[in-house]
């Protein structure tokens, strides 16, 4: 009966077109429903992390390239793109970031879930405190911009008045976000939050680029004016003042003060973008409970030589800056003497910093402590930024070396060989300092503080035993050693079981090692501040060195410097932050 009924049904469908059409439409409808449900499931599933990272990274990169394209068009000065167009574009980006930060903070407040996971290594409190100080200086700069707009409001675009207001609001909101949310490890709405965080990263990068471009334009304008006054070149300057009278008496003070605050605003935005990038990398990350612990800061006893040497370096830098800026406007002989003074000072500084970093590396060679290879996005980013920002100075240095060697047989300034020595030492100094900082960041710290006055001997064995010993038994042995042993003395587990040969043994007390490293960190810390101050406030003798201008041409050499000097400024300030972190944890 079943077979007969099935045959009849097939016969009816075959010879009845209406029935066949109904069955066909029913099957196609079922197929569409299955396809729709499958597509719905695939869209509602969690988007793959790598795909979300790639999409958001491409969005941010293209956003940055769009902004840089507008800046390059603005650099032509005679083109259709004006400053108000660039500022309007950046203002829109800041408003979008403000909306995202507001939505994120409101959602965090409304959620009744437990406190989100937080990365203990992201955004140390002292870094956020330093950024707060830089933000205050940025707010002062915004106030000067608003005052400048009020004075010239009759002949300049309204975008120049809206921009500082939005920037001030953006700065205040962003500092609040950094203090209360930068450590969050986001686990909900990951794809949406990736785009929000990466938008904030590249918005700050664009603000950094805008600050660098404005500061460079101001420096180049003064540089051309000085060359014209000294008769070095037949150049023409571009009038950068508005074509109307200022309605207040402090417009010139506002415009002049802006460029003394630009270095702080530039460093603020580049550091914020780095911290937000770490937050972006932490989205969806599973934290390691063992490594995600905040280590205590160590003591600072025995600090004398490092701070003293750093203060001498800082005082020397300020003196060189003042003398250089004064003599630069005088006669050609005094101008050449000022440039020579800078290079002599630079050679002495580079040599001292090479010795300091090399001594720190030698101290590390005296201990048998393994490297920390755990996952830490903040530390990885620190290392990558150190190496990437070194490229600017290295390019500038090797160009100077090529120019000095190429002009060796011809008439050259008196400081040509000093410039060659300075360039080579600059390359060496950054190589050694990078090694010292990176090894310090990756060196594993002991969980217990060592007593500097304890009569212990720090023994070094070659080759190291790390990787041979089973660390799983160390905790058990430590527990047994803590128990008092009757009639016997327990040996410290920090000493090897067998005595070392005399040629492979080096005795250094832990307290002495800590003092040496802390003094080195403090000395390098203040030296990097000194080397940041000079170019940040106008001491840039590379522009006044005729060797590179004759070898590469003025346009090529100026382009190299306009790229290399901002990277060098960031390198010095980033080294300051890294060295202070090493100083606290060593």
From Swiss-Prot:
Coiled-coil segments: none
Membrane topology (UniProt): Multi-pass membrane protein
Keyword Transmembrane assigned: yes
Keywords linked to the UniProt accession: Biomineralization, Cell membrane, Cell projection, Hydrogen ion transport, Ion channel, Ion transport, Membrane, Transmembrane, Transmembrane helix, Transport
Effect listed in the UniProt record for changing residue 429 to V: In backstroke; causes otolith agenesis
Residue ranges annotated as Cytoplasmic topological domain: 1-52, 107-124, 183-190, 282-303, 363-380, 439-518, 580-586
UniProt effect for mutating residue 394 to A: Abolishes homodimerization. Impairs surface expression
One GO term describing the cellular component: microvillus
Extracellular-side positions: 75-82, 148-157, 218-255, 327-336, 406-417, 538-555
Residues making up the signal peptide according to the UniProt record: none
Biological processes annotated in GO: cellular response to insulin stimulus; inner ear morphogenesis; negative regulation of type II interferon-mediated signaling pathway; otolith formation; otolith mineralization; proton transmembrane transport
Keyword 4Fe-4S in record: no
Compartment(s) of residence: Cell membrane; Cell projection, Microvillus
Pfam families named in the record: Otopetrin
GO molecular function: cholesterol binding; identical protein binding; proton channel activity
Reactions the enzyme catalyzes: H(+)(in) = H(+)(out)
Disruption phenotype: Fishes display the backstroke phenotype. Mutant fish exhibit otolith agenesis without additional effects on the sensory epithelium or other inner ear structures. Otoliths are essential for the perception of gravity and acceleration. Larvae without otoliths are unable to orient dorsal side up and rest mostly on their side in contact with the ground.
Transmembrane segments: 53-74, 83-106, 125-147, 158-182, 191-217, 256-281, 304-326, 337-362, 381-405, 418-438, 519-537, 556-579
Protein family according to the UniProt entry: Belongs to the otopetrin family.
Subunit details: Homodimer.
The protein's role, per its UniProt record: Proton-selective ion channel. Biphasically modulated by acid and alkali, mediating proton influx and efflux in response to extracellular acid and base stimulation, respectively. May be involved in acid and base perception. Sensor for ammonium chloride (NH(4)Cl) in taste receptor cells. NH(4)Cl acts by increasing the intracellular pH, thereby generating a driving force for proton entry through OTOP1 channel. Plays a role in the regulation of Ca(2+) flux in response to purigenic (ATP, ADP and UDP) stimuli, leading to increase in cytosolic Ca(2+) due to influx of extracellular calcium.
Domain topic, free-text comment: Residues involved in the gating by extracellular Zn (2+) and pH are located in the extracellular loops between transmembrane domain 5-6 and transmembrane domain 11-12.
Protein name per its UniProtKB record: Proton channel OTOP1
Chain's gene name: otop1
């Amino acid at each position: 009966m079943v077979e007969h009924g099935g045959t009849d049904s097939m016969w009816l469908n075959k010879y009845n077109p209406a029935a066949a059409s109904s069955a066909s439409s029913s099957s196609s409808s079922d197929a569409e429903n299955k396809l729709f449900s499958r597509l719905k499931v695939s869209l509602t599933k969690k988007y793959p992390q790598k795909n979300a990272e790639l999409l958001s990274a491409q969005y941010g990169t293209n956003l940055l390239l769009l902004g840089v394209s507008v800046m390059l068009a603005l650099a032509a000065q005679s083109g259709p793109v004006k400053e108000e167009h660039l500022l309007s574009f950046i203002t829109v980006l800041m408003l979008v970031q403000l909306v995202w930060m507001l939505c994120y903070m409101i959602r965090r407040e409304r959620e009744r879930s437990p406190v989100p996971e937080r990365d203990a290594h992201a955004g140390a409190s002292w870094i956020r405190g330093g950024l707060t100080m830089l933000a205050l200086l940025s707010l002062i700069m915004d106030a000067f911009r608003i005052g400048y707009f009020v004075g010239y409001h009759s002949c300049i675009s309204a975008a120049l008045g809206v921009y500082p207001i939005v920037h001030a609001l953006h700065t205040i909101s962003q500092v609040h976000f950094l203090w209360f949310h930068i450590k969050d490890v986001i686990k909900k709405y990951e794809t949406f939050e990736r785009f929000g965080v990466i938008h904030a990263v590249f918005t700050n990068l664009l603000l950094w680029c805008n600050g660098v471009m404005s500061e460079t334009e101001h420096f180049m304008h003064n540089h051309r004016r000085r060359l014209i006054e000294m008769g070095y070149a037949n150049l023409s300057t571009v009038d950068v003042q508005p074509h109307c009278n200022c309605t207040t008496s402090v417009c010139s003070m506002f415009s002049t003060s802006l460029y003394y605050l630009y270095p702080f605003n530039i460093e603020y935005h580049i550091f914020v973008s780095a911290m937000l990038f770490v937050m972006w990398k932490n989205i969806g990350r599973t934290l390691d409970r063992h490594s995600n612990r905040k280590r205590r800061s160590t003591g600072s006893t025995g600090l004398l030589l490092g701070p003293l040497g750093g203060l001498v370096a800082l005082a020397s830098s300020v003196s060189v800056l003042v003398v250089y800026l004064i003599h630069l406007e005088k006669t050609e002989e005094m101008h050449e003497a000022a440039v020579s003074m800078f290079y002599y000072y630079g050679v002495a500084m580079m040599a001292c910093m090479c010795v300091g970093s090399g001594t720190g590396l030698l101290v590390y060679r005296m201990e048998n402590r393994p490297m920390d290879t755990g996952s830490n996005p903040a530390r990885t980013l620190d290392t990558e930024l150190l190496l990437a920002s070194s490229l600017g100075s290295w390019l500038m240095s090797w160009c100077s070396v090529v120019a000095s060697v190429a002009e060796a047989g011809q008439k050259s300034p008196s400081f040509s060989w000093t410039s060659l020595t300075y360039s080579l030492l600059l390359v060496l100094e950054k190589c050694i300092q990078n090694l010292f900082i990176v090894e310090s960041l990756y060196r594993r710290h002991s969980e217990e503080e060592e007593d500097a006055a304890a009569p212990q001997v720090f023994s070094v064995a070659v080759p190291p035993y790390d990787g041979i010993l089973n660390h799983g038994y160390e905790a058990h042995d430590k527990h047994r050693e803590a128990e008092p042993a009757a009639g016997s003395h327990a040996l410290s587990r920090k000493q090897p079981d067998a005595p070392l040969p005399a040629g492979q043994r080096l005795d250094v007390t832990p307290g002495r090692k800590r003092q040496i490293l802390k003094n080195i960190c403090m000395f390098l810390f203040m030296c990097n501040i000194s080397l940041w101050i000079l170019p940040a406030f106008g001491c840039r003798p590379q522009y006044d060195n005729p060797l590179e201008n004759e070898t590469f041409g003025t346009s090529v050499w100026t382009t190299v410097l306009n790229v290399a000097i901002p990277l060098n400024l960031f390198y010095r300030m980033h080294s300051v932050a890294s060295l202070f972190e090493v100083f606290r944890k060593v």
